[in-house]
């Protein structure tokens, strides 16, 4: 039985949220604060984190929050923690953090208590940082609350401050010829809000990187590129894979039949555009990709559980399929979106 999140919060709540964002935004540090950030080869960086939230299909309440820590530069998972959570707030464009960040903060706190030696030195977040309606996206929110350096990595352009996914923007994307190529995202205000990054030689779709907390944009972009074995940075990619697998296992333990499970164990599908009314409007489920910079589930195919090592070994010796975020494609028992 599907669960539905609460209705749109009253305007008083949205006003309080805006005030909280403004208060926390004053604490954002958009410069390098760590010695490893100032080293061209990131000497001293050993642990990179990634976070993600996956949804039970057709259910806007039940979700899985996941935190992984990878060794650097090997990009091997050394820690993972996934938890089923109940989302109390609905999705409202521009306020994603109030829906998801509390659960991510809890995962960081659990890691600090259980394995403090494995605390990440930087966290890559599936979403935006200062590239946001009010300059304080989910990556900023998580960074300020945990005091960890954070990077926002989005797969869709958030169209704010005059940024548009128009013909000119598409022309700039075409000029990104190789992995590591970039162009700045300059708003109408003249502010550089982030960078478009071609993350992989075989991917034509850029990522949109922005500062979250305690890191400069230049270092954030360079590190994001260094973490990309495929299109999606490995910390976020692994958090996504493992959160989906955790949902599958959990549904199986609850006695959901495989035929039902395949319809419910993927990223929650999201509308194709911002809800009518623009930023701040309510979406029934999930996050419209153009609103918060996350892609639809079609770009996030899940591999077969237990297949990760074999897949990585195969890919290390073969060419990568163009624009595939999580290669190989989903097995037959995992439903792909229409």
UniProtKB/Swiss-Prot annotation:
Residues 253-338 are annotated as: Disordered. Monomer. Interacts with PABPC1; the interaction is RNA-dependent and stimulates ENDOV activity. It is found in: Cytoplasm; Nucleus, Nucleolus; Cytoplasm, Stress granule. The gene is Endov. The record marks 91 as: Interaction with target DNA. Its EC number is 3.1.26.-. Highest levels detected in liver with high levels also found in heart, kidney and testis. Expressed at low levels in brain. Changing residue 133 to P: No effect on activity. Pfam families: Endonuclease_5 (PF04493). This is Endonuclease V. Mg(2+) binds at residues 52, 126. It comes from Mus musculus. Keywords: Cytoplasm, DNA-binding, Endonuclease, Hydrolase, Magnesium, Metal-binding, Nuclease, Nucleus, RNA-binding. Endoribonuclease that specifically cleaves inosine-containing RNAs: cleaves RNA at the second phosphodiester bond 3' to inosine. Active against both single-stranded and double-stranded RNAs. Has strong preference for single-stranded RNAs (ssRNAs) toward double-stranded RNAs (dsRNAs). Cleaves mRNAs and tRNAs containing inosine. Also able to cleave structure-specific dsRNA substrates containing the specific sites 5'-IIUI-3' and 5'-UIUU-3'. It comes from the Eukaryota. One of its GO terms (biological process) is DNA repair.
């Amino acid at each position: 039985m599907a669960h539905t999140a609460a209705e749109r919060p009253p305007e008083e709540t949205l006003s309080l949220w805006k005030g909280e964002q403004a208060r926390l935004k004053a604490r954002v540090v958009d410069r390098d604060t760590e010695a490893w950030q100032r080293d061209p080869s990131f000497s001293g960086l050993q642990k990179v984190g990634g976070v993600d939230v996956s949804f039970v299909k057709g259910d806007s309440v039940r979700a899985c929050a996941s935190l992984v820590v990878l060794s650097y530069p090997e990009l091997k998972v050394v820690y993972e923690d996934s938890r089923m959570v109940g989302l109390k707030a609905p999705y409202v464009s521009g306020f994603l953090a109030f829906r998801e960040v509390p659960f991510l903060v809890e995962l960081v706190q659990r890691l600090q208590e259980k394995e403090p030696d494995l605390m990440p030195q930087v966290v890559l977040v599936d979403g935006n940082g200062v590239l946001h309606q009010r300059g304080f996206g989910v990556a900023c929110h998580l960074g300020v609350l945990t005091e960890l350096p954070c990077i926002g990595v989005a797969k869709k352009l958030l169209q704010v401050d005059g940024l548009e996914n128009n013909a000119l923007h598409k022309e700039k994307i075409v000029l990104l010829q190789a992995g590591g190529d970039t162009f700045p995202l300059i708003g109408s205000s003249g502010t550089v809000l982030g960078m478009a990054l071609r993350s992989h030689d075989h991917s034509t779709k850029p990522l949109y990187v922005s500062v979250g907390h305690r890191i400069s944009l230049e270092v954030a972009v360079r590190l994001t590129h260094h973490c990309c074995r495929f299109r999606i940075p490995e910390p976020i990619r692994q958090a996504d894979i493992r959160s989906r697998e955790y949902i599958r296992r959990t549904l199986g333990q609850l006695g959901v039949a495989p035929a039902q499970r395949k319809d419910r164990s993927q990223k929650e599908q999201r509308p194709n555009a911002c809800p009518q009314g623009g930023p701040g409007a309510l979406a029934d489920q999930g996050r419209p990709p153009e609103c918060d910079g996350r892609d639809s589930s079609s770009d996030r195919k899940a591999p077969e559980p237990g297949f990760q090592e074999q897949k990585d070994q195969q890919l290390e010796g073969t060419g990568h399929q163009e624009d595939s975020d999580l290669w190989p494609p989903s097995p037959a028992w995992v439903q792909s979106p229409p």
